[in-house]
Design a protein with these regions (language model features):
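Short catalytic/metal-binding and nucleic-acid-binding patches
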Residues: 1-175
Length: 175
């Protein structure tokens, strides 16, 4: 198991599916009381709800940027860094569910670094928040719940009425 701490703990048991979320730098104003005071098990849900309605940068809604991130995610799978199980690109954050083939820290660094370089070249900006959220999947039931969560994220945020209608998601059926 690979464990490490930055601002949050990260636990990566070998052979476990991994749910990872990245958000744009400045996408949540400091502090967000619902996030800060949420119990550890509910912190992610509170932050994700706040992201859906945050007034910060929304550079990922630029289709050129979203396409680049999708290309990076698919390249990582083609290069056997991971199996990409589910994903969604939201206006200010990204959710993925992967089965890592290598160190998850290296995967996170590679995906965020490559997608930021390519996106920033389009926008002339900086992008990702340094910290990311990750959670290893403990059961098939949890795996299925996380896939639904990822693919239904645009519906929950009110952007579309059906998950298949969001073009930058594994639910859209585009490959």
């Amino acid at each position: 198991m690979a464990d490490y701490y930055r601002h949050m703990p990260h636990f990566h048991p070998e052979g476990a599916y991994l749910f990872v979320t990245w958000r744009l730098h400045g996408s949540l104003p400091p502090p967000v009381p619902d996030v800060i005071y949420a119990t550890p098990g509910h912190r992610f849900a509170a932050e994700d709800r706040a992201l859906a309605h945050a007034g910060g940068p929304r550079w990922l809604e630029d289709t050129r940027v979203a396409r680049r991130i999708v290309e990076v995610l698919r390249t990582g799978e083609r290069e056997n860094l991971y199996e990409l199980c589910a994903w969604v690109i939201m206006p200010n954050h990204v959710h993925i569910l992967i089965l890592p083939s290598s160190d998850p820290r290296k995967i996170t660094h590679w995906v965020k670094g490559r997608s930021a370089r390519e996106s920033n070249s389009l926008l002339g900006r900086t992008g990702w928040q340094q910290e990311s959220y990750d959670h290893f999947v403990r059961s098939r039931k949890e795996y299925d719940r996380i896939v639904r969560y990822i693919e239904e994220n645009p519906v929950a945020a009110g952007f579309v009425t059906a998950a298949e209608g969001w073009p930058f998601s594994s639910a859209s059926g585009t490959s």
